[in-house]
């Protein structure tokens, strides 16, 4: 549970923002240098979305997107209240919010905020403005399809509400963000229920972070399956890859597992195959950022390596993701756009350079695991088995069709 009163520590220079100024700027969604200020407490809108049993990494509250800054975990729990699309885009791009379902909810909130930032009475002009802002949000993370899915859904709602005028349009968008978040929570629970029986006793390897931080409620995707199995009495031990270069496994997955009290061990990315050979791993389960029509799956860089190792050792490899992660407009994994991130993520750690200057750096954020290496896809409608083309199509058909929205009316 959050503390009754916020706890603060000040270690910055004399001209650092005061406590009250920090709260004011944070509430307004402003961005400034907070390297010398730590907010370890929970207050205001953030308190509405943070309890031990009902943790929400991202939520829509009182006309704002409220989210936990994942870049500061595990050392600080800093909650951000964002009131304009630029701040939402910044949060997505810099991975203050991450995880495909979570950035979908955040992106939906950004679209709703776009409707409120311009007091236009001409509905056509307002729609054009919202669509322009929606495309800016879409461009922040090109691989995760949930972001585009949520943005497209919000634009359909905007167009549908347009005949009723600007006020009705804004209200409809705000309501839809909450609907998407509620659906996300329900999907997490169903994924956990379907997947838990697949988890064997023994060692479970996971990669990146797929817990409560990646959804708008519930326990996430792959980690939700693990937690459900553990709660049902399965004697398991989680091995979490550190997940270079952003260390989501070390910083975030271990944070989730420690909070939940699940037995777990952090390992280097390169150690997974060795543990498999020693018989310490009985299953692998990961999340997904985009699943193509044939089941090829894009996920955090290093996932493909884990799948290859699992295949070589005859260990089941599972993917857990909601239907919004399916993209039937993409026939196979080779067509999935792969985000290339900044070289500094590899050449620096904590702002300290660890590699020589002037070197070439490749930093793809994701890789693609071919469907043939995936034992099953656990989704909110059930368990899908190889070959995946028909099961993926059937599951995707139960959701709204992806329609790319241009910046026009």
Ranges and model annotations:
Residues 96-267:
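N-terminal active-site beta-alpha-beta segment that forms phosphate/nucleotide-binding
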Residues 9-20, 30:
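Intrinsically disordered, low-complexity segments enriched in small polar residues
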Residues 235-236, 241-409:
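Conserved phosphate- and dinucleotide-binding cores of soluble alpha/beta proteins
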Residues 68, 106, 148-150, 205-209, ...:
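Short beta-strand segments
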Residues 80-96, 197-204, 348-358:
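Short, hydrophobic/aliphatic alpha-helical segments
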Residues 44-86:
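Positively charged, low-complexity intrinsically disordered leader regions
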Residues 20-23, 34:
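Short hydrophobic alpha-helical segments enriched in small aliphatic residues
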């Amino acid at each position: 549970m959050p503390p009754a009163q916020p706890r603060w520590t000040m270690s910055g220079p004399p001209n650092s923002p005061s406590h009250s100024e920090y709260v004011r700027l944070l509430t307004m969604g402003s961005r400034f240098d907070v390297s010398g200020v730590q907010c370890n407490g929970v207050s205001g809108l953030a308190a509405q979305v943070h309890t031990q049993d009902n943790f929400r990494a991202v939520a829509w509250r009182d006309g704002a997107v409220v989210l936990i800054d994942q870049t500061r975990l595990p050392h600080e729990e800093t909650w951000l209240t964002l009131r304009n699309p630029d701040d939402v885009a910044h949060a997505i791009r810099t991975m203050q919010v991450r995880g495909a379902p979570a950035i979908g909810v955040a992106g939906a909130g950004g679209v709703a905020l776009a409707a409120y930032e311009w007091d236009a009475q001409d509905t056509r002009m307002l729609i054009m403005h919202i669509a322009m802002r929606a495309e800016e949000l879409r461009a922040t993370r090109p691989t995760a399809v949930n972001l585009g899915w949520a943005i497209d859904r919000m634009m359909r709602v905007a167009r549908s509400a347009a005949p009723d005028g600007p006020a009705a349009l804004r209200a409809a968008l705000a309501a839809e963000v909450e609907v998407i978040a509620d659906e996300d929570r329900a999907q997490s629970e169903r994924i956990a229920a379907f997947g838990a029986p697949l988890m064997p006793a023994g060692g479970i390897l996971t990669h990146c972070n797929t817990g409560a931080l990646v959804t708008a409620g519930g326990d996430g995707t792959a980690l939700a399956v693990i937690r459900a199995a553990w709660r049902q009495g399965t004697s398991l031990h989680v091995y979490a890859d550190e997940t270079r270069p952003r260390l989501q496994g070390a910083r975030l997955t271990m944070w989730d597992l420690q909070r939940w009290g699940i037995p777990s061990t952090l390992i280097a990315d390169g150690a997974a195959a060795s543990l498999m050979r020693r018989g310490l791993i009985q299953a692998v389960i990961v999340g997904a950022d985009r699943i193509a029509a044939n089941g090829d799956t894009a996920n955090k860089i290093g996932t493909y390596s884990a799948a290859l190792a699992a295949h070589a050792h005859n260990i089941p490899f599972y993917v857990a993701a909601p239907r919004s992660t399916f993209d039937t407009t993409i026939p196979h994994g080779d067509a999935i756009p792969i985000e290339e991130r900044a070289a500094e993520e590899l050449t620096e750690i904590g702002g300290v350079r660890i590699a020589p200057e002037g070197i070439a750096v490749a930093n793809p954020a994701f890789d693609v695991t071919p469907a043939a290496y995936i034992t099953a896809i656990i989704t909110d409608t059930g368990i899908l088995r190889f070959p995946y083309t028909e099961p993926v199509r059937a599951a995707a058909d139960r959701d709204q069709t992806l329609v790319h929205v241009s910046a026009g009316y």
